[in-house]
Amino acid sequence: MNIKLITVGKLKEKYLTEGIAEYTKRLSRFCKVQVVELIDEKTPENASEAQNNQIMAREGERIQAKIGSRDYVIVLAIEGKQFPSEEFSQKLEAIAVNGYSDITFIIGGSLGLSKAIKQRANLKMSFGLLTLPHQLMRLVLIEQIYRAFMIQQGSPYHK
């Protein structure tokens, strides 16, 4: 299985980079992980809704260019479905059983994701109503992917 994380914005914080590297290393037993960082658009102060939509559309075009035609796409969106860890693990397993070998997770920039990217998604997923920096969300997501594989293995990691 191949897991791709497409993210908008550059990760600068060393502690987050180290955490993501650790979970990527742990996941290498189960899958290949690729992190794709895309440039985020500069948002003017007091930007209008139209300007925000244009920014999300431009970011969306860059995201779309990195999605494979046969990828199962999961976007992180506040309006998405929330999963307990066990159910998320089952969902990833079901995706693989249904013939998808490439799963792409997408984390948008500070404005979120364009409508086009949300429409391309096979699944919209949410980690709740909290607002988190998208850089921190990368670490949370990759830890949950690792946890999902450990649940599938019956590992005590999840306990």
Curated annotation (Swiss-Prot):
Q: Where is the signal peptide?
A: none
Q: Where in the cell is it found?
A: Cytoplasm
User: Which SUPFAM superfamilies does the entry link to?
Assistant: alpha/beta knot (SSF75217)
- GO CC annotation: cytoplasm
Q: Which reaction does it catalyse?
A: pseudouridine(1915) in 23S rRNA + S-adenosyl-L-methionine = N(3)-methylpseudouridine(1915) in 23S rRNA + S-adenosyl-L-homocysteine + H(+)
Enzyme Commission (EC) number: 2.1.1.177
Name the InterPro entries on file. Alpha/beta_knot_MTases, RlmH-like, tRNA_m1G_MTases_N
Q: Which residues bind S-adenosyl-L-methionine?
A: L76, G108, F127, G128, L129, L130, T131, L132
Top-rank taxon of the source lineage equals Bacteria
The protein's UniProt keywords, in alphabetical order, are: Cytoplasm, Methyltransferase, rRNA processing, S-adenosyl-L-methionine, Transferase
Please give the Gene Ontology molecular function terms for this protein. rRNA (pseudouridine-N3-)-methyltransferase activity
Q: Give the transmembrane region(s).
A: none
Q: What does this protein do?
A: Specifically methylates the pseudouridine at position 1915 (m3Psi1915) in 23S rRNA.
- Family per UniProt? Belongs to the RNA methyltransferase RlmH family.
Q: How does it assemble?
A: Homodimer.
Q: What is this protein called?
A: Ribosomal RNA large subunit methyltransferase H
Q: Which organism is it from?
A: Leuconostoc mesenteroides subsp. mesenteroides (strain ATCC 8293 / DSM 20343 / BCRC 11652 / CCM 1803 / JCM 6124 / NCDO 523 / NBRC 100496 / NCIMB 8023 / NCTC 12954 / NRRL B-1118 / 37Y)
Starting at the broadest rank, the lineage of the source organism is: Bacteria, Bacillati, Bacillota, Bacilli, Lactobacillales
